[in-house]
Amino acid sequence: MTTDKFLFSIIVPTYDRPQKLALCLASFVKLEYPGDRFQVIVVNDSTEISIETAVSPFQKQLNLELLSQPNSGPATARNTGAFAAKGKFLVFTDDDCTVAPDWLQTLETRFAETPDCLVGGRTINALPDNVYSTASQQLIDYLYSYYNAIGDRAQFFTSNNFALPAAAFQNIGGFDTSFSLAAGEDREFCDRWLHSGRRAIYAPEVTVYHFHELTLRKFWRQQFNYGRGAFLFQQTISKRAENAKKIQHPSFYLNLLIYPFSQKSGIQMLLIAALFVLSQTAIAAGILREKKNSSPN
């Protein structure tokens, strides 16, 4: 249900990261935008872990609503928040992100020009000294350079920084909740959005900062889960369109592997290049795991 009161509803799914959530909410307080024109909906993806301590200091500073659900994954959490939202436009970010002060203002400018589009912004790694976090973001940057090379004909956004009309979100059914991991659900949503005949626009001036601390083990797990999500994504789009592309052209992978050399120099560049190779191994392992699990015994 939308109202004339709020132009934007910011949806933040969260799971057991109260300190990061507090930083995220603090960045909303600093937005250079009228406080009575947006609301914040935090969806706690757990009924067992309380986040009241992190949220309560912001209750009087923001139009903030806290919802809780049994642990079901970020896709379901985003839907829970979106279907309770009252704003004309939904804006999604994650609990480990902070937003630029002009975040909503830049979105308003974009929607004034293209009110029916999905608008995706730029994500900046906020932990440049963490090589695993840097590699993870550079992998996303490469995908953006590939899929969003033509800004007004974009194809893919991560769900930590995109916005769209609330009515259109509900019309296409929200996120696919069969994606239980934080992997593939945003890719599937973008594909379904485009498949419905709608348009997506890349707006790099719409900026968030990502504080995702990774270790080697966490990096592997993240990429492994991306592989699991990629398998489910391919299964899903195959049902949607018989001629759906299942394998990228070899040049996609070649350009991916050389991409780090265009971004950094020195030792970190070599480490990131090695992590790019490792990521493809982890993704392949995740795909094989899901393929095995989906095969009849």
Regions found by a protein language model. Give the residues of each.
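N-proximal low-complexity "stem/linker" segments adjacent to membrane-targeting elements
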Residues: 1-30
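Acidic donor-binding segment of Leloir-type glycosyltransferases
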Residues: 25-68
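Conserved donor NDP-sugar-binding/catalytic core segment of glycosyltransferases
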Residues: 102-133
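Donor nucleotide-sugar recognition loop
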Residues: 98, 155, 170-194, 198-202, ...
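A recurrent flexible, glycine/aromatic-enriched loop bordering the glycosyltransferase active site
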Residues: 125, 145-167, 180-182, 188
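Non-catalytic, C-terminal membrane-associated alpha-helical segments of glycosyltransferases
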Residues: 225-228, 240-297
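Glycine-rich, basic loop-to-helix element that forms the pyrophosphate-binding segment
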Residues: 53, 69-85
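Short aromatic/hydrophobic "clamp" motif used to bind/position activated sugar donors
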Residues: 90
